[in-house]
A protein has these predicted regions:
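Surface-exposed, charge/polar-rich loops and edge strands
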Residues: 4-16, 23-30, 124-129, 137-141, ...
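N-terminal active-site beta-alpha-beta segment that forms phosphate/nucleotide-binding
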Residues: 8-125
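Short capping loops/turns at secondary-structure boundaries
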Residues: 119, 142-143
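Short polar/charged helix/loop
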Residues: 146
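Redox-cofactor binding/interface segments in oxidoreductases and associated redox assembly factors
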Residues: 58-60, 131-132, 188
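Short glycine-rich anion-binding loops that position phosphate/pyrophosphate groups of nucleotides
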Residues: 62-64, 134-138
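A structured binding-face within diverse protein domains that lines the active/interaction site
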Residues: 112, 132-134
């Protein structure tokens, strides 16, 4: 069973749920990953909110996550300001401007991120945030990786928030807490789901 409707799961139960979804992601075919990447990028770039955005916070995709590397390249080619998260202890992150991937350095999680010297971008200066997850549901809530970085950060900004997910990684419902913030939309390769927050 890949969705859990009840609230207030323990840390162990959430960890088990993440494991189930990550195993599902690991089993996706290369063909499907390539095709869905193209569809997700197409739908993301079709959003009026994205087209109008001047400053966009992306995340650096790893493993079988939807490909943000091509998104970042295209955004830079369009003249947008692109940013990536810089992580700090205690679940704190900041948006820092990037001009290319050669500027990045491995974080303590081994995920490339901007150097401390990269220009910081205030949360209120962001127009659009591409939000990661282990899984999104059809109500705009996410099962994150468990560190709480985005839970804290999204509470600081008024930017338009957009989750990206493969259709096969959409859950009917993920567990949620009172502090969880729903994204404004979720983009898959096949559809764009929107909510009024």
């Amino acid at each position: 069973m890949l969705s859990v409707a009840r609230e207030g799961l323990s840390m162990n139960e959430k960890a088990e749920l993440r494991k189930i979804w990550m195993e599902r992601e690991a089993g996706l075919s290369e063909n499907y990953i390539t095709e869905s990447n193209a569809g997700i990028i197409r739908n993301l770039f079709s959003l009026q909110e994205f087209q109008c955005a001047e400053t966009v916070l992306f995340f650096y995709s790893i493993w079988s996550e939807p490909d943000t590397h091509e998104m970042i390249r295209r955004a830079l080619d369009l003249g947008k300001t692109a940013a990536l998260p810089k992580t700090y202890p205690k679940g704190v992150m900041a948006a820092r401007k990037i001009g290319g991937f050669d500027e990045l350095k491995p974080s303590r999680f081994d995920i490339p991120e901007p150097d401390e010297s990269a220009p910081a971008i205030d949360p209120d200066a962001l127009d659009f945030i591409v939000v990661p997850s282990v899984a999104f549901d059809r109500e705009g809530y996410r099962l994150g990786h468990g560190a709480g970085y985005y839970d804290r950060y999204l509470a600081l900004t008024r930017a338009f928030t957009c989750g990206i997910a493969r259709e096969k990684m959409l859950a009917p419902r993920v567990p949620r807490e009172r502090h969880d913030i729903r994204v404004n939309c979720v983009v898959t390769e096949n559809e764009i789901l929107r909510w009024r927050n």
